[in-house]
Amino acid sequence: MQTEATFILGDWEITVSNCRFTCSSLTCGPLYRSSGDYTRLRIPFSLDRLIRDHAIFGLVPNIEDLLTHGSCVAVVADANATGGNARRIVAPGVINNFSEPIGIWVRGPPPQTRKEAIKFCIFFVSPLPPREMTTYVFKGGDLPPGAEEPETLHSAEAPLPSRETLVTGQLRSTSPRTYTGYFHSPVPLSFLDLLTFESMGCENVEGDPEPLTPKYLTFTQTGERLYKVTVHNTHSTACKKARIRFVYRPTPSARQLVMGQASPLITTPLGARVFAVYPDCEKTIPPQETTTLRIQLLFEQHGANAGECAFVIMGLARETKFVSFPAVLLPGKHEHLTVFNPQTHPLTIQRDTIVGVAMACYIHPGKAASQAPYSFYDCKEESWHVGLFQIKHGPGGVCTPPCHVAIRADRHEEPMQS
């Protein structure tokens, strides 16, 4: 069985193996102009074209049929396993648009020889799905003795065996970015799954609709089957009341990951659902400098039979304004994400800026040479290294199924774009 194939696409040599693409630059010299620590490089092909137009994976019509561990995330990372000592490094990122040309951030000067080639991998990760997670309902938010029960949202238990409950009504503003409301639950809640959340607009001073864009939601018990939902919005607004609806389902017991909040999810082209990561505060970064942004994503692991879990936080590969360095968020810990401004002018990161995405993976001790925030893919071991940790092949990790690979006889190159 032929498990590896190589072809040339413009200025790049591409090797396909185990549902992984390893890309190596062929051009020496002015491949790009380096104006600082990191330079943006637009690769003249898309992931969709690599998958559909250039390679054949066994007898299946699409690579998706080979990714047997479930829904996946496409990741680009450096392929030089040198522990961050190489002269040029490709910053890792999540590819969430398969149809547009791939963009990467490269640190260091353009290569002058073939030995200095830019080399990166595009591979697939199968993170733990939302069904392995549940949201904790906090205790201790009881109303003061003698206080009147607050006006509650309308709760309607859906006529389904899964006991889903629809909650509708208006949330009230308690601060420019925080909205709260109370609701009754048909059953006591210790954990829940937030299935959907929809904002139908706000009533602000002018009366114009202004929907909420939640950063995360928390739930607190305030009485007997009485609960408070708090929506933390991504930006300030003059809205006093917000019309919302959400559907939740009680969870009888803790799951593998117990989240301290319900966060918005981004669906990848291959069906995985990852958390959108927002900063806790607004910051302005001077040109060619870095800053740290505190992020809110608290969780605990309930049992570790399958291994230790963590959230791997990555920037988006399509981001053109800043570079988010990878981070590994451990249970019960706060994390700060390091962001670099490659521009020649100050850059302001707003509270509603998505600075990365978080996916839950099983982690293992990595190589001593891999230093944070460096990240690379080890093609020999078929494993992904992020800082001091390693994500191996398997569910909750890298998806690299062996298969027959061949180059399409009728393949065509895409137009080169700089």
From Swiss-Prot:
Q: InterPro entries recorded for this chain?
A: Herpes_Orf11
Name of the gene = ORF10
Q: Which domain of life is it from?
A: Viruses
Please state what the protein is called.
Answer: Protein ORF10
Could you tell me which Pfam families the record lists for this protein? Herpes_ORF11
